Curated annotation (Swiss-Prot):
Name of the protein: O-methyltransferase GME11366
Main function: O-methyltransferase; part of the gene cluster that mediates the biosynthesis of dibenzodioxocinones such as pestalotiollide B, a novel class of inhibitors against cholesterol ester transfer protein (CEPT). The biosynthesis initiates from condensation of acetate and malonate units catalyzed by the non-reducing PKS pks8/GME11356. Pks8/GME11356 lacks a thioesterase (TE) domain, which is important to the cyclizing of the third ring of atrochrysone carboxylic acid, and the esterase GME11355 might play the role of TE and catalyzes the cyclization reaction of the C ring.
Enzyme Commission number(s) of this protein: 2.1.1.-
Keywords, in A-Z order: Methyltransferase, S-adenosyl-L-methionine, Transferase
UniProt cross-references to Gene3D superfamilies, sorted A to Z: Vaccinia Virus protein VP39, Winged helix-like DNA-binding domain superfamily/Winged helix DNA-binding domain
Organism of origin: Pestalotiopsis microspora
One of the protein's GO biological processes: methylation
Inducing stimuli: The expression of the dibenzodioxocinones biosynthesis cluster is positively regulated by the transcription factor dibT.
Residues the entry annotates as binding S-adenosyl-L-methionine: G237, G238, D262, R301, R302
Group of enzyme by EC: transferase
Catalytic residues (positions): H305 (proton acceptor)
Length: 404
């Protein structure tokens, strides 16, 4: 019998109460949805025997291997989209693969609720497996398994090697140990065009590539205008310019110049892939002195999590040198809770640990910003929660308008 009977009863009541928020076609808040997910996960832990919980957690590696194998076999695309069943023999023929092997992989996926398994040797799509019909989601799953996975698995060995005093950095850490390479992870990606293509495709998914919708760009630039010839936004490390394009789409009447800064090859790729003419470009690394000085906004999207505190501080100080008394620094990144951090955010921090970076909690962001002699004005949260927060910082001498 489960050993946590009291929790089972309490959590069941809580889930029932939260579930009523979904009745009659209502759309609950993000907070209600997150509370329901958390309570459901806690109920699963309480309902299992303690030993079963250990085995369930340990087996998640095999679950991911099954899904990755299904992607390699193209099972998601070959499964009938209308939800009708297909036999193992039929789908194996389409895959040109051994039926017994395919059946075992599909069985493992279905046990994790990816695919339905209504009858013997027959499988079908369900709501979860249909998510993988979108190619970018398959690319993301493959990217995390193939790339981050090897690095994460090396964390314990690297920690032992360093006697748990350090987890290394961008150029020497679990990633280099896991892949037996001296290259940084970005150099490793760029050395293989197909690997880089897969990475970029995975990064386009909504949960990873969401733009900075939490911050009121229009209000900030209306209160502190830069004029049509002034620099409104510099997107540092902005890749193909997706964030600037998104901001322009959301706020088409913004006045001022939009500038993309990234490595020369990245900018060349951006232009080859249709970078709009309204976006100017300037080549440079994160740590080169910024040539676009006195911009109203210096924007960093999913950049700081690449770096440890030491390099992040260097990046802040480099940007600080380009700012004036009307400049804002916007850091679009995750903000982890100091207490009760969500599991996927905590696991993402370990993903970044394996690559030599880190996700940061609110107190860690505050400490980092203040150590650079900057002022943390506000952490902006949008309706997607802490996965898509924006940290706003300014010089202590800031003369612009507050947005609170």
């Amino acid at each position: 019998m489960p050993t946590d009977t009291n929790s089972i009863i309490a959590l069941s009541k809580s889930i029932g109460k939260l579930a009523r928020e979904f009745e009659n076609g209502a759309t609950p808040s993000k907070e209600v949805q997150q509370a329901l997910v958390l309570a459901s996960e806690q109920l699963g832990v309480a309902a299992r025997e303690p030993d079963d919980n250990v085995y369930n957690i340990s087996g998640q590696i095999s679950q991911n291997a099954a899904i990755r194998s299904a992607i390699a076999l193209n099972a998601f695309a070959l499964m009938p989209e209308d939800g009708s069943t297909i036999t193992v023999e039929d789908i194996s023929t389409k895959m040109n693969a051994d039926p017994e092997l395919v059946g075992r992989i599909l069985r493992a996926c279905a046990s994790a609720h990816v695919f339905g398994h209504p009858t013997v040797n027959e499988y079908c799509h369900n709501n979860l497996s249909r998510v993988y019909l979108q190619g970018d989601h398959r690319q993301l799953a493959a990217q995390i398994y193939d790339f981050t996975g090897h690095a994460v698995l090396a964390i314990p060995d690297f920690g032992e090697e360093k006697q748990w005093k350090s987890m290394g950095d961008y150029v020497r850490g679990p990633f280099q140990l896991g892949f037996a390479t001296d290259l940084s992870y970005m150099e490793y990606l760029q050395a293989n065009p197909q690997r880089l293509k897969s990475w970029n495709s995975g990064m386009r998914t909504g949960k990873i590539g969401h733009r900075t919708s939490a911050f009121p760009f229009d209000r900030a630039l209306e209160l502190d205008p830069c004029g049509k010839d002034g620099i409104a936004i510099v997107d540092v490390g902005g890749g193909r310019g997706q964030a600037l394009e998104g901001i322009h789409q959301d706020y088409p009447n913004l006045e001022g110049r939009l500038v993309l800064q990234d490595l020369p090859d990245v900018i060349k790729d951006a232009k080859a892939n249709g970078l709009p003419d309204y976006i100017e470009t300037t080549p440079g690394t994160f740590f080169d002195p910024l040539t676009a000085k006195g911009a109203r906004i210096y924007h960093f999207r999913r950049v700081f999590h690449i770096w440890t505190q030491t390099k992040a501080l260097e990046l802040l100080e480099n940007t600080k040198n380009a700012m004036n008394d009307y400049s804002r620094m916007l850091i679009a990144d995750m903000v982890l809770a100091d207490v009760g951090c969500e599991r996927d955010l905590a696991m993402q921090d370990l993903n970044m640990m394996s690559l030599g970076g880190m996700e940061r909690s609110e107190s860690e962001w505050t400490s980092l910003i203040e150590s650079a002699g900057l002022v943390l004005k506000k952490i902006w949260q949008n309706d997607q929660g802490p996965k898509h927060a924006v940290v706003e910082a300014t010089l202590p001498t800031f003369k612009g308008h507050g947005l609170e």
